[in-house]
Amino acid sequence: MAWYDNAVFYHIYPLGLCGCAHENDGQAVPGAFNKLNAWAEHAADIGCTAIYIGPLFESGSHGYDTIDYRLVDRRLGTNAEFKDFVARCHARGQKVIVDGVFNHVGRDFFAFQDLKANRENARYKDWFCDVNFWGNNEYNDGFSYGNWGGFNLLVKLNQRNPEVQNYHYDTIRFWVDEFDIDGIRLDAADVLDFDFMRGLRRLANEVKPEFWLMGEVIHGDYSRWANPEMLHLVTNYELHKGLWSGHNDHNYFEIAHTMRRLQGLCHDTRLYLFSDNHDVERLPNKLRNREHIRHIAILVYTLWGIPSIYYGSEFGIEGKKEWGSDWPLRPCLELSDFKDAETTNPVTSVYAALGRLKAELPELTDGEVKELQLTTQCYAFARVLDGKACVVVLNNGDSPAQLEFQLPVEASSAKDLLADTVGAQPVLTSMEWGRMKVQLPSNYATILQLEK
């Protein structure tokens, strides 16, 4: 099994966490990488075995308008400091993944500066898409060009140009040689050229054993991107939507159907599971009942896939988009403000417990998913491996509920694995004639380990 198959990710948006200037002023936040290292240590303490950190490299503003792929953003520090950060993570047993923003660059990228200066005679004009010297734009460049999402700040690269491909391939080799990273999250993979991604997979197989490629894909048939020829997996935005809307609408059918469909569609490829990230609002701002944060955390860790936590979400923090700005989703935080959270905060307590369980119980990672009971307000499924099983039980209703289902394995009793978490409630179970009954409190969820 590759390292990423049983990984638990911790996602850090470093420019936000460290409180960097929103526009690059070239000034480093003092001690930024010391702070990032402390957060990576915290992630290890709650069971996260991999750090996804990004965007990381020199840019003009939010990190995705890249200026220099081979220079750590000066607002954060230096290449040497990032190299040390990776080494410290590796010493703790954590892998490190960075953002690969290969679809577009910022306007200060060297090749685009050449295009602005030399127009039709530019050495690098073919590095960009849809360049039209008869057009113009809001910057009054005297030409127009392809972009991402309608934003001319993000200049679309021509990934079918062999020079562009080789430039990116060499960048990845540099990242591995210089920093010893373990993989890449491909930004905007849903608009990347497929042949380019095939080339990335061939390169990944060469640069480092088990070098990992994850693609940011919102909609579509995920198996087009996640397959043996291209990416190892993609982001599961389809489930992300179902996780919060399925609770708001009291509709577990949405979540169960999504998982069944995706497992069949992707041939059991493990997708990247998340409840929130740097682009979407935090759970407390999307849920009608914040008690359901517990349910969603449990689902992210127990459904088929690779779980992740976005920094701060383990503390239940809020984050809501403002008009034209995602910065409220990417706040500056201090660990010292959460020093007692694991023993006082119900959200932190359950995330820490889930991290421990994920490490201790292989059935939660590799076990077959067996659906046991499904209604609009109640959901029960098991993860079964080698005769052992953990049963996940959830009730999103405002009244207590009784679940009853066939036991997935032979058992005589059940242990509540989350009974010691902050805010835990008693769950009554009984077994008879191969069937199990569970009495669940209202708006409550837990994991039961079956025992013979």
Question: What residue spans do the PLM features occupy?
Answer:
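Substrate-binding/active-site clefts of carbohydrate-active enzymes
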Residues: M1-F9, Y13-T49, L56-E178, L200-E206, ...
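Loop/helix patches that line or flank the sugar-binding groove of alpha-linked glycan CAZymes
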Residues: A2-N6, E23-N24, A28, A256-H257, ...
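Hydrophobic faces of well-ordered beta-strands that scaffold small-molecule active sites
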Residues: V8-H11, I51-I53, V96-V98, I184, ...
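Active-site-proximal helices and loops of the catalytic beta/alpha 8
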Residues: R92, Q113-K116, D187-H267, L271, ...
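Short catalytic-loop micro-motif centered on adjacent basic/acidic residues
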Residues: I97-V98, G183-A189, L283-P284
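Active-site groove signature of glycoside hydrolases
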Residues: H104, H168-F194, L273, N277
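Solvent-exposed beta-strand/loop surfaces of large extracellular or lumenal domains
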Residues: K415-R435
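C-terminal beta-strand-rich structural cap/linker in extracellular carbohydrate-active enzymes
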Residues: S430-K452
